[in-house]
Amino acid sequence: MLHVVPLEWTVEEVVPYLERLAVWLRASVLVAFQLTATVALSVLSWWLMPPPVAELCERGRDDDPPPLSHLSLVVPVGCLFLLLRGPSIDRCPRKLPLLLAYCLPHALAFLTLLMCQPSPQAFVGAALLALAVDLSCLGASLLGCDPGASLRRLWLPSVLSLLCATALGLWLLRAAAPFFLGLHATTLLTVTLMLIHDLSLITCQSSFPESFQPSLRLYVENVALFIGMYHLLRLWLWSP
């Protein structure tokens, strides 16, 4: 089979591969930035939390979530409104504020879970919050059309991905520690690679897939990434 392999490459043949590599590198930077910013905001908020608030969280971990945790809904709802009414990412010349707006609600959701040591009800609420932000940021900016129509068209994939993420999270909460950690490492690696692939389509300005299965997979990846990052962050903060 070696005779079919080209031994000499022209510039025209190499350029498409270099462009593809550049797209993957750019997508990798975006993924790394979002992961780093989300975890950094969560950890910074946890360390800067006033002692009275920390004591309140300590008392509320074994019970229902403290009332303070519900304040984290304010900023994500505000970001959701701004992203629905504001410019999409591909039309905005300054993308850094929008990327930070994408990370901040996730960081607040992580912080809420860290504060509450969540009951199943709190976990469902946080998963729904992260999913709503993903829908607003990814759906509205990638589809490049009316955000309201985009969200209405994707309501079924979003509901199914929420159910899948909730079931996965509740199962992982009861998993054994060694299996738990190895599963999360594998999950994070797989999901990150899939997100890089999706972001490569985004950076190439390709059309968002209109079929049901790719859109469902995209949102399942995002919510699964949320779950995996939360558990890894919780293990790191409470490690002996």
From Swiss-Prot:
The keyword Transmembrane helix applies. The keyword Secreted does not apply. The chain crosses the membrane at residues 29-49, 64-84, 96-116, 123-143, 154-174, 176-196, 218-238. One of its GO terms (cellular component) is membrane. It is a multi-pass membrane protein. Keywords: Late protein, Membrane, Transmembrane, Transmembrane helix. Its main location: membrane. It is found in: Membrane. Belongs to the cytomegalovirus US12 family. This is Transmembrane protein HWLF4. The gene is US19.
